[in-house]
Every structure is written in structure tokens, then in C-alpha cells.
Amino acid sequence: MLTQDQLKLAVAKKALEFVPEDAIIGVGTGSTVNLFIEELAGIKGRIKGAVSSSEASTARLKAHHIQVFDLNEVEKLSVYIDGADEINHHLHMIKGGGAALTREKIVAGVADEFICIADEKKYVTMLGAFPLPIEVIPMARSYVARELVKLGGHPELRQGVTTDNGNVILDVHGLQIMKPVELEETINHIAGVVTCGLFARRRADVLLLGKQDGVEVLR
């Protein structure tokens, strides 16, 4: 039986098939993406470089001598490759376990195609078992938490974490997310919220799902 790490490695390798020649690609953040970066290093001569969604991924890319571009220098990205904490059958996701959700959402928004790489444990019928991360301006933390309670959630400050943008993360427990697009818009309209970890309005276009019998490609 394959371990979770072996499933992650399988999808990381499969993702190379979706990397166009001579392109600048978007690269996400997290344990599965770290494996993808290791694989990407083997074909780095085929690409121009990458736009990164976090300081951690930037450091890892640079360690492999892959050129990292500022997003403001890049007009478009053909593809963005990132993991997910949960993903449903409609390819809506919860992301932000690594606290990079805002930059991930920005880079994903620029890309023509979003490729999600995940193992089968992340594939769910309903989002919400994984606590929903919300990036919040620090002075608004208590207000935003009260508003999230009104939506039926139980927000908890992620201790000791400051995002790359200098903000805090509230992890919202206890949500059964029936309508991800609507909830994403509702939370994002709360004053003080930078963004929430629902990726439903900009969902994945392709899911590379690591399973015991191989990598399944879902669209």
C-alpha cells in the first residue's frame, strides 16, 4: 500500500506533463508543491522560471536555481500548480493550511489553467471538515471573529503565525459548506478580511488525484 507521501510524489511527477515549454509558471505552497519543485528542478532548462505564492516556495525555487519572477513583471501565466487541504467533486477547494492563501489566490487568478495536485485523502464530498483559514488585518481580528460566529463557525486564532503580508489567520471550525461560491463571497465582504481560504469562484481546472491504483486526472 502506498503511503501518503508516495501518493504526493506521484502527482508531483504527473504535474510535469502540464508544464509548457519555455513558460513562466505559477507555483503554489505546501508539502505536495515542495515535491513538485524538486521534480521541476529536473526540467528547469525547459522553462523560463516561476512566479511563487510564498516566501517559502521562493526560497525553495531559488535553492534549485529556478528564476523567480515578480508577478507584476508577468502579463500572464499559462498554468498555476498548487495543492489543496480539501477539494470537492466540483473542484472547489479549501486552501491556506500553510498561511499563503492570499498570494495563492492572486497567482491562481492570473493563470489560464489551475492544476491542483492532491492525494486521495484530500478529496471530499463536502468541504468544511478541514478548518477554513481566513487572512485578517490584525486590528479587525475580534470583529471578524464575531461575524464568523454569526455564520455558524467557531473561529480560532492560529497562534504564532504571521502571514507573508503581515496579517493573522483565523481558522474556522464547524462549517458544513453547502454553497462554497456564496460563502466565499460573504466572508470576503466582511470588513477586515483580506481573503478566505475558499477557492470556489476560481476553482481548479484540473485535479491530479493520487490514488492507490495511480493518478486520476479529473476536470
From Swiss-Prot:
Q: Pathway it acts in? A: Carbohydrate degradation; pentose phosphate pathway; D-ribose 5-phosphate from D-ribulose 5-phosphate (non-oxidative stage): step 1/1
Known EC number(s)?
5.3.1.6
Q: Which SUPFAM superfamilies match?
A: D-ribose-5-phosphate isomerase (RpiA), lid domain, NagB/RpiA/CoA transferase-like
The GO molecular function terms of this record are: ribose-5-phosphate isomerase activity
The record's keywords, sorted A to Z, are: Isomerase
Q: Where is substrate bound in this sequence?
A: T29, G30, S31, T32, D82, G83, A84, D85, K95, G96, G97, G98, K122
A GO cellular component term found in this entry reads:
cytosol
Kindly state which reaction or reactions the protein catalyses: aldehydo-D-ribose 5-phosphate = D-ribulose 5-phosphate
Instruction: Name the catalytic site residues.
Output: E104
- Which InterPro entries does the entry mention? NagB/RpiA_transferase-like, Ribose5P_isomerase_typA_subgr, Ribose5P_isomerase_type_A
Subunit structure as annotated in this protein's UniProt entry: Homodimer.
PANTHER family, alphabetically?
RIBOSE-5-PHOSPHATE ISOMERASE
The protein's role, per its UniProt record: Catalyzes the reversible conversion of ribose-5-phosphate to ribulose 5-phosphate.
What family does this belong to? Belongs to the ribose 5-phosphate isomerase family.
- Name listed for the protein in its UniProt record: Ribose-5-phosphate isomerase A
